[in-house]
Every structure is written in C-alpha cells, then in structure tokens.
C-alpha cells in the first residue's frame, strides 16, 4: 500500500505522546519474511496457494477470489487521515475488548505495520488490566523467532497505548481455511511444523501462550505462519520440572495445599509451569480449563490447542 495523498495536514490521533520505546526496526520484516520462506521451501508444497483444496476438490491457488470477514468491514470512500506516533493509520484489521488493531505505515509509505491501539478509557478502574498489557509488551520485546510476531515499538499517548508490530499481509489462517475448506496434507504439515517450532521456542524461554487458535495464527504474503496475540501469555520457571505425582494430583486440593503448590514466589510465579487463571477460547481449550478451577500446567494447555489446530487444518 502506498502513502495516501491529499491536501492539508494529517490529523493527529492524539496530541500528547507520554512515552515511546523503540525495540526493533520495521524494515527488518522483509528479511524475516525471506527467512520464513527459505525455511518453508525445503521439500514442501510451493507457496502459491498452500495446496488448498476448494469446493471442486483441486488446488484453487489461494483464496479462490473469496474475501475475508475483514474485507467486508472496509468502507468505500475516503476517510480523514490520522496519525499515531510516526505512523499513518489505515483500515481496521481486528477488534478486541479494549481497542482495535489498525494497519499502519510510515509517512513515506515504505513500511507497513500492525498497530494494536488500546483505549485507556476502556481499561476502567480494574487495577489488573494495565499490568496485563505491560506484561504482553514485556514478553513480546524479548521474542525473536521467524514464526512469532515481532514487536517494533510501544507508544503511549494521553488516550491510547499503542503496540506497533510486524504486519502479516496474508490475514488470518481462520479466514484462509474458511474460504477453502481444508488443506492438503503437505501444506498442513508445513504450517503445523511452523506452529510447533514457534510454540517450542516459547516454552524453552519459559513462556506459554494460552490462546492458540486459528484466529491468532496469521499468514505473511508467502503464506507462512506468524503466531500473534499474546494478551493471555504468561511466564513460568522453565527449568523447574514437575514430577508425575504433582501433575496427577493437581485437582486434589488437600495435596495442593500440603505441597504449597498454590503459593507464588516474589515474581508471582508458582512451581514449574503451574497456573490457575482460566483463559483462552473454549473451542481450543484443554479440558482442565473447562471442567474445574484447579491448577493446570501451562505447556500442556498449549499442546492441546496445537492438536485442535492440526485437526482443523485437515478436516473438511
């Protein structure tokens, strides 16, 4: 997308920047895209269409002319242009509880990004919401993997908190499958390998995602996976392995209390990857998140979600 043109100055999204932190250069996204493509190219389905099987049972080469649900939300006609920090704001890519994700680009039109705009007023008086946002930013800034979204910048204004990230031009994997029914085995294997690579990287770094689903798996222009939306992500002690006895007795409240498994350390973490907050999306959630409020192991929750995603890739 090129830089928009028109008479007059650009309208500012907000007049006061309170804080601005640069993490990575958005220009690096081109190199990251090439890296993903090189890793995906070895002995697997070419990227021209992901080997998708359409209604006629053959590879339709991509979306088959269909539009995503985001496409329908784009309004015709020209809107007043606004800026956020050093970026021009474009169309809405998605919406959440606290704000929107907008397409953005540098004022010279050279670099596209995704900007998660969180309205300060939407946070209300709940004291846990703002730390959760800062935790997401803290987790993202320490990640560097070709199949995990890259954080570029954090900008705080008097009205919004903006998280500027790598833009995935291929949209959601959910939309891709919705429009094409299912994938051929080779294409599904390639995408699932990328997902597992990213999740394995997170777990080695002591991070669980806790909301893995098709809607949070984006595609770059070459149809390679980018894991995104770390709003429910949390950290854990990666080197503290729990024994089978502990994992087997997590629903036994007396055992949990006796072993002090419900206690947290000075960083707010329990033993190993034990967690208690129920979160994520019901269709992808592990049973222990749905049937009880007991402690659970975070990594296994991610593994379960990966299994659901694999089934979704293969079943019509």
Tell me the role of every PLM-derived stretch.
Residues 112, 117-143:
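Conserved N-lobe beta3->alphaC-helix segment of eukaryotic protein kinase catalytic domains
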Residues 89-97, 101:
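Protein kinase glycine-rich loop
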Residues 154:
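Activation-segment/catalytic-loop signature of the eukaryotic protein kinase fold
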Residues 191-192:
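Activation segment signature within eukaryotic-like protein kinase domains
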Residues 1-84:
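Intrinsically disordered, low-complexity regulatory segments that flank or precede the catalytic domain
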Residues 149, 158-166, 174-175:
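A conserved loop-to-beta-strand element in the N-lobe of protein kinase catalytic cores
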């Amino acid at each position: 997308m090129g830089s928009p043109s028109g008479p007059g100055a650009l309208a500012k999204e907000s007049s006061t920047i309170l804080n601005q932190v640069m993490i990575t250069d958005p220009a690096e996204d081109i190199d990251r895209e090439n890296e993903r493509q090189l890793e995906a190219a070895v002995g697997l389905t070419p990227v021209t269409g992901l080997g998708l099987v359409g209604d006629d049972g053959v590879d339709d080469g991509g979306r088959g002319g269909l539009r995503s649900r985001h496409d329908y939300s784009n309004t015709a006609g020209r809107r007043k242009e606004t800026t956020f920090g050093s970026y021009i704001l474009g169309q809405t890519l998605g919406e959440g509880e606290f704000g929107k994700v907008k397409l953005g680009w540098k004022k010279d039109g050279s670099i596209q990004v995704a900007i998660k705009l969180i309205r300060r007023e939407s946070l209300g008086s709940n004291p846990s919401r703002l730390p959760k946002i800062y935790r997401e930013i803290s987790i993202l800034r320490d990640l560097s993997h070709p199949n995990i979204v890259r954080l570029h910048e954090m900008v705080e204004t008097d009205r919004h908190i903006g998280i500027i990230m790598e833009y995935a031009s291929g949209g959601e994997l959910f939309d891709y499958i919705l429009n094409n029914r299912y994938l051929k085995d080779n294409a599904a294997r390639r995408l699932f390998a990328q997902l597992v690579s990213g999740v394995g990287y997170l777990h080695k770094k002591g991070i669980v995602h806790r909301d893995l689903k098709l809607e949070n798996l984006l595609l770059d222009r070459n149809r390679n996976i980018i894991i995104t939306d770390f709003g429910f992500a949390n950290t854990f002690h990666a080197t503290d392995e729990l024994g089978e006895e502990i994992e087997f007795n997590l629903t036994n409240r007396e055992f949990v209390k006796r072993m002090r498994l419900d206690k947290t350390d000075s960083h707010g973490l329990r033993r190993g990857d034990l967690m208690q907050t129920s979160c994520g999306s019901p269709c992808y959630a592990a049973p222990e998140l749905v049937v009880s409020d007991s402690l659970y192991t975070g990594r296994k929750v991610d593994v379960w979600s990966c299994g659901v995603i694999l089934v979704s890739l293969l079943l019509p």
